[in-house]
Every structure is written in structure tokens, then in C-alpha cells.
Amino acid sequence: IDTSLLTEFYFEERIPALRGCVAVGSGSSNWSLDRMLYPFAGFAPPGGSCYSVAAGGHFSGGGYGLMSRLDGMVVDHIAGIELVTLDEKGVANTILVTENDTGEKGELFWALRGGGGGNFGVVTRFYLRPCQRRNAVKLSTLSFPWESNTESGLDTDKLAALIKAYGAYWETHNSPLPDDPNNELFALMR
């Protein structure tokens, strides 16, 4: 089922339990959320960095990303989820589950947030509580050529040395202490 056209986002004002949340269509990509939601709502969810991955799959799987060390995973900020299910007669029903629900709806809310593969219906919309606003984020990127048998290229031995140095750097420079400026470091090797 293609949800790529479900890309709207807005401040929810109609549903009392979700008032003040930002409603995000499940087809919204990580890139569009970061690019559009931050100027619109003053925050971006702490989700992934793959620009083409959409909220429907990423959020349902937990939503780990570059800002997760600071703000948790995206599922930590989901207050509600709208989905379409089929009843026993094959009739489509739109269901809204929220963090305040109990019983079957509460269990469904839990399962849709990374607890069971997200295959309980077609998620059409997420409702996110705002994360802390970040005025600046530092990003550093290093690229290495992969051509072997050249002085600047990475052969197997150079790659092994790079990975070992990379791991040693993060092991000594990353801090779990909340007041340490290095507690916000995030490493990604692609």
C-alpha cells in the first residue's frame, strides 16, 4: 500500500487529548520532516538520516536517529496514531489510538510504536509531542576513496585500521554524563 501522498502536517487543535501535537502524515519522508517541520513547528523528530525513508515505517519501528541520544527515539514523542483496519466483514475502519488509551486500544498503541512490527493496519497519521528545540547541530563528514592499490585508497588493511581507530575515538570521547558536552555525540559509519 503506497502511503507516499500522505504528507500533510499541521498542529492538532480539534482532538482534546492531542491538542498542541503536530499531526504528521505517514508518507512524510525524514528529509521533508526535518526540512519543513522545524521552521513550521520549531522542532524536528529525532528520527533517522535516510532522506527517503517515510514516517510510516520508520516511526513504527521505533524511530532511532541522529538526535536520539538527546531526545530519545521518535516513539517516545508519539502521543497518538491514526490507522485504517479491516473488520471481520472486510469493512475499512479508521481508528485513533492515544497514549492515554487502556485495554485493547492501549495495547494497539504500544504495538504500533515498535512493539510488534507495525502490521496491525495501515498507519495514516502520527501525532507528535514537540521535542526540545535545537538552535544548532554540528555535523562532520569524512569520505574516503575505496580504490584499492592506490596510496590514498582504502585497502583491507587500511579499512581495518580506520575502523579500529574510529571505535577507539568514540569509546574515549563519548560520555554518558548529562552535563558533559560529549554526551550528545552520535557516530555513523556508512
Where are these regions (language model features)?
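C-terminal cap/substrate-recognition region of VAO/PCMH-type FAD-linked oxidoreductases
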Residues: 94-190
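FAD-binding glycine-rich core of flavoenzymes that anchor FAD
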Residues: 1-108, 168
